[in-house]
C-alpha cells in the first residue's frame, strides 16, 4: 500500500512539475516533501 501511494505521489509530482500552471503548488509541495523523498 505504501509503495502504491508513493508511486502515485511521484506520478502526481511529475505531472505537476510538467505543468507551468502548477508552479506555485510545485514550490509548496517541495517545501512539504522531505529531502530524502524529493531526491528519489
From Swiss-Prot:
First-level EC class: oxidoreductase
Enzyme Commission numbers on file: 1.2.1.-
Keyword Oxidoreductase attached: yes
Gene Ontology terms for molecular function: oxidoreductase activity
Keyword terms, alphabetized: Oxidoreductase
Transmembrane segments: none
Domain of life: Eukaryota
Further comment found in the protein's record: On the 2D-gel the determined pI of this protein is: 3.7, its MW is: 35.1 kDa.
Protein's name in the database: Putative NAD(P)-dependent glyceraldehyde-3-phosphate dehydrogenase PS5
Taxonomic source organism: Pinus strobus (Eastern white pine)
Amino acid at each position: 500500500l505504501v509503495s502504491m501511494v508513493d508511486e502515485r505521489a511521484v506520478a502526481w509530482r511529475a505531472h505537476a512539475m510538467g505543468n507551468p500552471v502548477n508552479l506555485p503548488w510545485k514550490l509548496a509541495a517541495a517545501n512539504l516533501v522531505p529531502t530524502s523523498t524529493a531526491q528519489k
